[in-house]
Each structure stands twice: as structure tokens, then as C-alpha cells.
Amino acid sequence: MSFNTIIDWNSCTAEQQRQLLMRPAISASESITRTVNDILDNVKARGDDALREYSAKFDKTTVNALKVSAEEIAAASERLSDELKQAMAVAVKNIETFHTAQKLPPVDVETQPGVRCQQVTRPVASVGLYIPGGSAPLFSTVLMLATPARIAGCKKVVLCSPPPIADEILYAAQLCGVKDVFNVGGAQAIAALAFGTESVPKVDKIFGPGNAFVTEAKRQVSQRLDGAAIDMPAGPSEVLVIADSGATPDFVASDLLSQAEHGPDSQVILLTPDADMAHQVAEAVERQLAELPRAETARQALNASRLIVTKDLAQCVEISNQYGPEHLIIQTRNARDLVDGITSAGSVFLGDWSPESAGDYASGTNHVLPTYGYTATCSSLGLADFQKRMTVQELSKEGFSALASTIETLAAAERLTAHKNAVTLRVNALKEQA
């Protein structure tokens, strides 16, 4: 189905509607699964030697020193323009402001007299950040991951990226205070972070996007007892735009294309109650597409994308919630009025002047978001992902005495005798003291 085909939602059957909201299938082929498993085992067994071999094989690069020196990072910084450095500084400031505001206040309550319960927060001790390389290095992801890691207080932050690492990535690491940077990419980088090697430290949790091999490696290490936790399941990038007749077609088209250019498996959807708007957006997409360097990539993504006309904005919201987009852009006359009805979205952008690019780079929200329908249960990345919560309880003699019979009754009902005895022994000890 061509992206220029405008679909009337209410003329479709329930099955056709379901098909319209289906995402392009993603699944690791058996060969990818096997290849990744072999890479993980090899890196775990052979450490740095395996990493160097994979760099030569996949990156066509000879890596002598896996760790990037402070001198190399400083030199990279000198090669960047002041304009780019200033832009990064503004982005970091906004990201820092928003994520600092996410700090949870401690919880300290007395649930009943003499029974004190607390919730305290601790940082994840060590985290690994994977930053893809290639022709368009995602240095903005360094800012999005390293900034909350620093605010959370993670003691060790390790960054891996395929060699040769772009100057922008090295400077972003320096700007965010990341000192441990390694010339390692692909599934082998995930293996190094999960298991550790002679050079690369093992970490507790791994963050960051990547290709099918990286995604599969993250999945596999998260399921191994000796592996590492991961940030969230990953899928292709996606955006859904809700627009009414008051929207600017060129703005809508630019937002759709900003996601389509990510990759051929990206998906973009327009929902509008205005058929004229759908036609105008389709025309604007074609005009803008002709000017894009990544036009072919975007055009492939548009093959799995949709222009859908609904009966009203309420139906747009209903359909959006069914789909649960990674990015939701609302370009309507009263965009904020729709927010309360939104139940599933990674990040929401309101009004004509809130392009998705703002969240990708510099507004302050995080651009690491759940995709592929995971918005139903997963949240956008935030400070909490670099922290863990711990509960504390303390009972005084009086508090324990008042609660003892309740605990004994519940434990007995579950036939957990040792649980009951742990209370009864203390009750008897108090009686002897009396």
C-alpha cells in the first residue's frame, strides 16, 4: 500500500483496522541468534583477543589500544566547532534540569504505631552505554544516557562504540564526565560489557540502541545468569501524528519524514479527521522527500506507513492508544486538551512548535523510548532506570507486639510454620521479659 493512499478508518472492517495498526515484523533470524551466541561465548572465553579479532573482521579496523586515551579525547574536542560544542552544552543543561527534577523524595512513614517503613533510592553501581557508529554517529545518545547516569550517582560508567570513534561521540563523553571509553562495537561490545574482559569492565546494566546483532546480544545477555540487565526491548523507530484542519501540512510532513529517515523498518502514521489535511500532507511529504539525502531510506519506510482519516479527534486518540507509538505528535488547535486521554505513548509533542526533533536533541526529555507497542507497559528512559529502590522496616517492641497476632494468623493460613515461629518465639521472649 502506497503512503499516498488515504484510508477511511470507518470504512474498514475490524480485521482491516487491526492490519493497519500492525508494525513491520521484527525477529532475529536463526543465523543472527546463532552468530550472536557464538560471539558472546567467544568474548567471554577469550576476552580482549576476541574483541580485536572482531574489530578486524566486522569494522575492518586494527585496534591496538581498546581504551581511548584522555589525550585522544582531548584531541577530538579540539577538532570540533565551537558552535557544535555550545549546542551540546545547551542540550546537556536541559537534559540535566529535567532529569534532576525526577529525583524521588524519600518515603518514611509509620504504617501503625511502632511500625516504621521507608523507601530509599540507590544508584545502579555500574552501567554500560552502547553508542552506534557509522556514517551518522549518534552522539546525542551519549548525552541522553550519560547525563542521568551522572545525576543518579552511578559509580562506574563505561562507553563502547565501534572504531574509529567519531570526534562528536568522544567530546560528548568528555562533556558528560565519562572517562572509560572503549573502541568496541557490535554484539562483541555487549558481550564485553556483560561479562568483562581484561580491558573492559563488567557492568550491571547496559543501555543504548543498535542494529539487529546488538539488539539480539542485549536480549541474550539479559537472560544469562552471568550477564547484565538491559534498559528496554528495542524495535524500529516510529511516530504517530494527530492533526486537525488547523495544522500546518509542511510541519506534519517534516515530522513524519524525520522518523522515516531513521531506517527502512521505521513506521509513520497520520491520523486526522480532515481528508483535505491528509491530501495536503501527502503532497508535502513528496515535496520534502525529494530534497532529503536519505530519501531512499525514508521512501522504504513509507511503504509500511499510513494516512488515516477518522470521524473526529476522539477517534484519533482511541486509535493512537491502540497503537501506542514511540513518538506521538499532536498538532491540533487545542493540543493540550487531548493529553489526559492519551494512555500509551513514549513521548508526546504538543502543538506546532514542538517538533519531534526537539525531544531527540535538546528539550530535556529523553529520546530513548519504548517502541513496537511496548509503551503499553514500559516508560521512556529516565533517572529511575539508573537507580533502584530499596525498602526498610523497623518495628519497636510495642509495634511488633501489636502486629504479632496478625502476622501469625496470616502465616498459619499459608501453612508457613517457620514464618509463624519467627513471630511466636519473639512473642514468648517478650512474655518472659515482662
Swiss-Prot record:
| UniProt GO cellular component terms | cytosol
Quote the record's binding site residues for substrate: S237, Q259, H262, H327, D360, E414, H419
- Superkingdom assignment: Bacteria
Alphabetized SUPFAM superfamilies for the sequence = ALDH-like (SSF53720)
Q: Which PROSITE patterns match?
A: HISOL_DEHYDROGENASE
Gene Ontology molecular function: histidinol dehydrogenase activity; NAD binding; zinc ion binding
Matching entries from Gene3D superfamilies are given as: 1.20.5.1300, Nitrogenase molybdenum iron protein domain (3.40.50.1980)
Q: For this protein, what reaction is catalysed?
A: L-histidinol + 2 NAD(+) + H2O = L-histidine + 2 NADH + 3 H(+)
Q: Relay the cofactor remark from the entry.
A: Binds 1 zinc ion per subunit.
Q: In which pathway does it act?
A: Amino-acid biosynthesis; L-histidine biosynthesis; L-histidine from 5-phospho-alpha-D-ribose 1-diphosphate: step 9/9
The GO biological-process annotations, alphabetized, read as: L-histidine biosynthetic process
Q: What is its EC number?
A: 1.1.1.23
Entry similarity comment: Belongs to the histidinol dehydrogenase family.
- Quaternary data: Homodimer.
What does the function comment of this entry state? Catalyzes the sequential NAD-dependent oxidations of L-histidinol to L-histidinaldehyde and then to L-histidine.
Give the protein name, as stated in the record: Histidinol dehydrogenase
Origin species:
Shigella sonnei (strain Ss046)
Q: What gene makes this protein?
A: hisD
